Amino acid sequence: MRLLPLLVGFSTLLNCSYTQNCSKTTCLPNAKCEVHNGVEACFCSQGYSGNGVTICEDIDECSESSVCGDHAVCENVNGGFSCFCREGYQTATGKSQFTPNDGSYCQDIDECSESSVCGDHAVCENVNGGFSCFCREGYQTATGKSQFTPNDGSYCQESMNSNCHLEHACIAANINKTLKRIGPITEQTTLLQEIYRNSEAELSLMDIVTYIEILTESSSLLGHPNSTTSYKDAHFNSTLTEFGETINNFVERSTHKMWDQLPTNHRRLHLTKLMHTAELVTLQIAQNTQKNSQFDMNSTDLALKVFAFDSTHMKHAHPHMNVDGGYVKISPRRKAAHGTTGNVVVAFLCYKSIGPLLSSSDNFLLDTQNDNSEGKEKVISSVISASISSNPPTLYELEKITFTLSHVKLSDKHRTQCAFWNYSVDAMNNGSWSTEGCELTHSNDTHTSCRCSHLTHFAILMSSTSSIGIKDYNILTRITQLGIIISLICLAICIFTFWFFSEIQSTRTTIHKNLCCSLFLAELVFLIGININTNKLVCSIIAGLLHYFFLAAFAWMCIEGIHLYLIVVGVIYNKGFLHKNFYIFGYLSPAVVVGFSASLGYRYYGTTKVCWLSTENNFIWSFIGPACLIILVNLLAFGVIIYKVFRHTAGLKPEVSCYENIRSCARGALALLFLLGTTWIFGVLHVVHASVVTAYLFTVSNAFQGMFIFLFLCVLSRKIQEEYYRLFKNVPCCFGCLR
């Protein structure tokens, strides 16, 4: 009984908040009746406002402009509203209709993610709420416009002015247009994705040139992350991969037909810019890594490898790269720095098919099919790049770089060389192959090994003008060195003989003496300085000295021929007058030729290969021309002398058989061949038609010319034998040999 009041009170409390259907009150259709504390009342449904009895008006939620958020349209309906994304936008779930209370919002649709959205020969540019299509250079729509949207039925077709890409003004205009279009992009990843996406499709010549310029102009942005923090491993790898694939798109084999349309100097300019930018950006990206790392990427026509390490790991780091059957390795001067801390980045790039683009031929597509093209140097290997960036710069200094590269094709009949692409950052249009600072250590038919003292882009060159194989070339080099050393010794003995033996002094020995002096100096300078090509000024001076001394030697050979002719024919001459003119002709005329040549083309003295005259603009003929003239004169004199001597010998000694006369004349003729320099005719033949036979004949006969002169003028001369006998007769070790 005591609990009854509590139950009654609790029941009353429940009735105050209990709602039930109305029985007396009538509400509008958009309202509902509810009972509260025993009182009936009408309430408008959600989305309506009013008293529920006489009025229930729809609430216009769309009157608040921001109710659906950005890039959305609000649509009011009875009792509510719906949000619709504008064209070009959608929610994260891919829907176009939503209500904001579920957390959805509209974001831009990247229509350009579908590569074919604009059709062939077009580039897609994504913008907020849509996209635009641009025809590539050389193409336009039927209306002549370059910009369009595909839903209007437009597409890109070849322009009537499709040769515009060959004009500098057209190239510059397209570059400026593209720079203006992507100029607002200030984020590294976005810019890289934009360039990569546009390089994926089939590229025209204008596309290649334009985006190489974009890469060059944007190298500072591409090489640095979007914030001050370092790269995470995943971001570092993905960024380098995407950058490497972008470079690969510009140099892959399918683009070679486009590159062929550019003149050689323009082709080299843009390739130099591309290689320089690739090297620079790769180093910059790698400098922002968080820790010691290594990265590898291998695409169809480009391979990339990066080493990043700090000073504590230097002694364990061995930067190297295996490339297409080859190998490249960097050796630093020191592998550990005492008390110095810092970071080091080493980057290798291998361009697998870029070689033909950098060959000396104007039409490399045809040249690659012709192994016998004259006057060309062809790249027969991959082109590799090696670069170092250390902080501080002295932390990791280069001692040498060694590499072995496989040949693209066999080169058993050609000479190979180690070369690097020599260019200046301020003058990239002057890029060319050079051998300075590089040394060939080994070569066979399939591979060549090199050692260089600097870093840049390296390759193996094949000289297609040479018909001499590597083995023959090495043998000829050794023969030349040995022959010149022996000749120098023999010429020194000849000079001593003709200078100090008073009993044999005559006009003839004076000529012999000057010939031997000129030839001795020429061969000495050749032996010491022919390969000193590291310093252009020194190399030019050596080339000038060689030019003068060899011409002087030829001049005295000519004097030998003229003097012998005068003796044989029996012309009476004034010795004093003749001596004076001999010296003028022997030493002054070569000086005039060299001085005149130097005034016209001093830059042609010394080449990147050897310190000799350049073949450019036929400058080599400033030596070959006078030499050929002297050889011709001496050949005529040689013929007359042999004829006169043979007839004279046969007339004086009729009892001597014809065979003996011929034998005597043959021995004299052989002596004259070397004395008059007529053996140089083999050199002329080798220039006209190079062959292994002419190479060996020229090398042996002229490298040993000093030895032959010593044999015929000294050893086989009775007068000089007597002088040697008198000189050495009191020397016990020599007397027995001279008896």
UniProtKB/Swiss-Prot annotation:
List the PANTHER family hit by this protein, alphabetically. ADHESION G PROTEIN-COUPLED RECEPTOR L4 (PTHR12011:SF59), ADHESION G-PROTEIN COUPLED RECEPTOR (PTHR12011)
CDD domains, alphabetically?
Answer: 7tmB2_ETL, EGF_CA
Keywords of the record: Calcium, Cell membrane, Disulfide bond, EGF-like domain, G-protein coupled receptor, Glycoprotein, Membrane, Receptor, Repeat, Signal, Transducer, Transmembrane, Transmembrane helix
Q: Report domain GAIN-B positions.
A: 293-468
> Where does the entry annotate site (Cleavage)?
L455, T456
Mind telling me what this protein is named? Adhesion G protein-coupled receptor L4
Annotated region (GPS) at 418-468
- Residues of the EGF-like domain: 20-57, 58-107, 108-157
Q: What is known of its domains?
A: The transmembrane domain is not required for cleavage, but it is required for dimer formation.
Q: Which residues lie on this side of the membrane: Cytoplasmic?
A: 503-513, 570-581, 644-667, 717-739
